[in-house]
Amino acid sequence: MPALISQDGRWWWDGTQWRSRVVEGKLDLFWFTSTPEWFARVLITGLIGLIPIVGAINLLGWTLTATDMVRRGWKELPPAGFQYLERGVAPFVVGLVYGVVLILVVGILALSTLVFAMSGRTHLVIAIGFALLMFLLLLAWWLISLYLLAAVLVASDRLGIAKAIDPTRLLALARANHDISLHVALVYLAASIAVATLSVATSFIVPFSSLVISLGLPAVYAMIVPNLVAFRVEAAPSLPPT
């Protein structure tokens, strides 16, 4: 049942009291839980997110639309639907490009590790070294990608794919918005750990529980929306060449 909205559009009835639909002061981490139909919008958007590729693109577009709504002063999540696909293409493409580069580098290291491991005991130490390097590279990439998450989302949307692919520009923007970038990274990191822990803990009891838990991913993106609103793409130009 649709939420009851006041005539001026500024208030909605939650069944017990009138709540504001406009931003009033600083938003907390769970700001969206006091907005109309938030649970249904998160759940349906999460279901759409289960669709390979299309779901991920739509979720990114939904997050950027939520950012625009909060920036304009509306304390509300966007309705669920597929209308955010176009908006989500840019950040998805940027992430895909960096992902392909990572796969190529890791693939070369994995192949080198396999070759040295099969060359006899004399090359086993080298193979272990390549394996360790590959692990450290994956760990570093994951941590850096968390730190650059806000920059990728905002820069790809505001500046376009071509400029957002530039790693020096992304790094400059992330450093210029250091507190925001770090907060987004920590929120997403904590959410990832929580999801992984719950998935492992419940997988032995409830089959496919990880899919059910992943339905809450839109809520994680909703948590970082206030930070995306505060992120400034004008804060820094691309770093000069060294």
Question: What does each of the following model-derived ranges do?
Answer:
Residues 4-7, 75-79:
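Short, low-complexity cationic-aromatic patches
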Residues 28-48, 79-104, 146-197, 225, ...:
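Interfacial aromatic "cap" segments that immediately flank transmembrane helices
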Residues 7-8, 15-16, 50, 117-120, ...:
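Short, flexible beta-strand-to-coil junctions
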Residues 21-41, 45-71, 78, 82-145:
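Short, small/hydrophobic-residue-rich motifs at membrane-helix boundaries and re-entrant hairpins
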